Design a protein with these regions (language model features):
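Amphipathic, non-transmembrane alpha-helical secondary structure
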Residues: 55, 59, 63, 120-131, ...
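Catalytic domains of carbohydrate-active enzymes, especially glycoside hydrolases
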Residues: 57-75, 126, 211-217
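Conserved, mostly hydrophobic/aromatic
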Residues: 43, 61, 72, 107, ...
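N-terminal small/glycine-rich loop or linker at the start of catalytic domains
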Residues: 26-49, 229
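C-terminal active-site rim and adjoining tail of enzyme catalytic domains
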Residues: 2-26, 197-357
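Metal-dependent phosphodiesterase/phospholipase catalytic core, i.e.
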Residues: 17-32, 37, 85-200, 219-220, ...
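Active-site beta-loop-alpha junctions enriched in small/polar residues
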Residues: 45, 74, 78, 86-87, ...
Length: 357
């Protein structure tokens, strides 16, 4: 692993770093600027109330108070960037076909199984909606899926971005999320002005991206709990990396994310007190997350006193956390081995530097 990490550092990496995403960092609390609250990022829109990854879900996310929207990109058979999490149409649209085998004309006629039976949007449709003046501050995380050729998919994303012009340049509103080295390299080639983030579920794999200048991270929250996660968080803070975490739906997990930003001496991005470790919380329930933020601040301000846990409950919570950490670490190793065997986790030592375009 040390040799793989060393391969990321070269002269080219110092000359043309990946752009940063200052709009995506944790925000200072209006109550106390020393508190840095992770932004609320709606996972596939407001998917608890609307069919996921539809325009209705995106509109619902904004109404729920989300600062940003996370959504997923696939490529149709005729080269159109479309929004869907699954490569198959079965779960959401009830059709046993794959997106990559269907034309946009066919896909556009489908409706979700879940009511109110929404159509699949193109990335272009989503961007056109985002041009509305009242949505100017809403930003986006694109989860670029691995099921297509990376160059073809990034080129299709680029065509969609070029076809729609908004009040703020898209490279100042969009973070492009990539799972592996091949897709990161394609993004650097096709979308050189856009901030990038590595999406990860295995710290064993994610670790070798740490030394890529300005590369953000979007990591499964389960992997960040426990000793290995703590070390990874410390390294992200030391190198001032953007960090988003997913999918955080339980109040305890939401509060854990908020508390990671407490007790640090200085914010490196703004030279002010209270650095953020976690910049964004990707959740199915942005409204609940905003409520948890308010409750957390009430506690910090002395307006709310948390009931003291009994000894039995304290022991139970610690046992649950230990079990959670052990299961997560075991699952992470198995997942890492599986994805390497499938050829999905390629390393940067096998690619050109991300900073050579």
């Amino acid at each position: 692993m040390a040799a793989e990490r060393q391969s990321l550092v070269n002269k080219d990496a110092q000359s043309a770093a990946i752009p940063t995403a200052p709009w995506a960092v944790a925000q200072p609390s209006p109550r106390d600027p020393s508190r840095w609250l992770p932004q609320a990022i709606a996972h596939r829109g407001a998917k608890l109330d609307w069919p996921e990854n539809t325009m209705a879900a995106f509109r619902g996310a904004v109404k729920a108070g989300a600062h940003a929207i996370e959504t997923d990109i696939h490529l149709s058979a005729d080269g159109v960037a479309v929004i869907s999490h699954d490569p198959s149409l079965k779960r959401c649209f009830g059709v046993d076909n794959r997106i990559s085998e269907c034309s946009w004309e066919y896909l556009s006629a489908l409706r979700t199984v879940a009511e109110p039976h929404e159509p699949m949007p193109r990335l272009k449709d989503f961007l056109e909606w985002l041009t509305h003046p009242e949505l100017e501050k809403i930003w986006v995380v694109l989860d670029v899926k691995l099921n297509n050729d990376p160059t073809d998919l990034m080129a299709a994303i680029g065509r969609a971005l070029d076809s729609v012009h908004g009040p703020v340049p898209w490279d100042q509103r969009i973070v492009v999320g990539c799972w592996n080295a091949s897709f990161l390299q394609a993004a650097r080639s096709q979308l050189p002005s856009y901030p990038l983030a590595h999406i990860g579920i295995s710290l064993l794999y994610s670790h070798h991206f740490l030394r890529v200048p300005n590369l953000g991270f979007s990591l499964n929250q389960m992997t960040l709990v426990g000793p290995a996660g703590k070390l990874f968080l410390r390294e992200l803070q030391r190198t001032d990396k953007l960090l988003m975490t997913w999918t955080v739906n339980e109040p305890r997990r939401m509060e854990w994310c908020i508390r990671q930003n407490l007790g640090h001496p200085r914010h490196p991005r703004t030279n002010s007190e209270g650095p953020a470790i976690i910049d964004g919380v990707i959740t199915d329930n942005p409204r609940l997350y905003r409520e948890i933020c308010e409750k957390f601040e009430d506690e910090m301000d002395g307006k709310f006193v948390r009931p003291k846990l009994s000894f039995t409950q304290t022991v139970k919570n610690k046992a649950e956390t230990l079990t959670f950490v052990l299961l997560t670490q075991s699952w992470m190793v198995l997942y890492h081995v599986l994805r390497r065997w499938q050829g999905k986790f390629d390393f940067l030592k096998d690619r050109q530097t991300l900073d050579k375009r």
